Curated annotation (Swiss-Prot):
EC id: 2.7.1.25
Protein name: Adenylyl-sulfate kinase
Record has RNA-binding as a keyword: no
Reaction equation(s) it catalyzes: adenosine 5'-phosphosulfate + ATP = 3'-phosphoadenylyl sulfate + ADP + H(+)
Taxonomic path: Bacteria, Bacillati, Bacillota, Bacilli, Bacillales
Any single GO BP term: sulfate assimilation
UniProt record similarity statement: Belongs to the APS kinase family.
Length: 197
């Protein structure tokens, strides 16, 4: 609950002014999927290409955020919810500043993704399901996390002993089991360009 003595200060530069200057709309491009599905790889590759084309874009990555803003959170259901809530609020600040925010978070719970959607205007949140089956993610295991989870070294690991709730109606599906990184990156870049005109 917000203290009644805390007053909201309106920004001197409006979101519309940022959009006009940037020549594109701002929005949250929310990549969700299992660990190892390719979220961070695709997010960073797409951001690099969009940036090269003049877009104001940033990436919020799950691992990176847990080194600072969310370093006090663990991986219980409650901490995961708080992790996503905080990221949603940060992403909203970027949207207000005219930036396209590409996020790369497992974000396993539908309810939490829905709450982030409600933070911004209807056309400013785009759920992107980075789809990849568990077996393929385990085979990739770029950080060795699945192996540790299977050995009981990491509790509450999504896909192993903690659930992942697949999006029911995402705006975009990137199937990294069927398409390579370049194809998925190109698909995401085109989607972002189409949605932020």
């Amino acid at each position: 609950m917000v203290n009644k003595d805390i007053v909201w200060h309106e920004a001197s530069i409006t979101k519309r002014e940022y959009h006009e200057k940037n020549q594109h709309k701002s929005s949250i491009i929310w990549l969700t999927g299992l660990s190892g599905s390719g979220k961070s790889t695709i997010a960073n590759a797409a951001a690099r290409e969009l940036f090269a084309q003049g877009y104001q874009v940033t990436v919020l990555d799950g691992d990176n955020v847990r080194h600072g803003l969310n370093k006090d959170l663990g991986f219980s259901d409650e901490d995961r919810k708080e992790n996503i809530r905080r990221i949603g609020e940060v992403a909203k600040l970027f949207v207000e500043q005219g930036t396209i925010v590409i996020t790369a978070f497992i974000s396993p719970f539908k309810e939490d993704r829905g709450l982030v959607r409600q933070l911004v205007e209807e056309d400013e949140f785009h759920e992107v399901y980075v789809k990849c089956d568990l077996a393929t993610c385990e085979e990739r295991d770029p950080k060795g996390l699945y192996k540790k989870a299977r050995n009981g070294e990491i509790p509450f690991f999504t896909g192993i002993d903690s659930p992942y709730e697949e999006p029911e109606t995402p705006e975009l599906v990137l199937d990294t089991g069927a398409h390579n990184r370049e194809e998925c990156k190109n698909q995401l870049v085109q989607y972002v360009k189409d949605q932020t005109k």
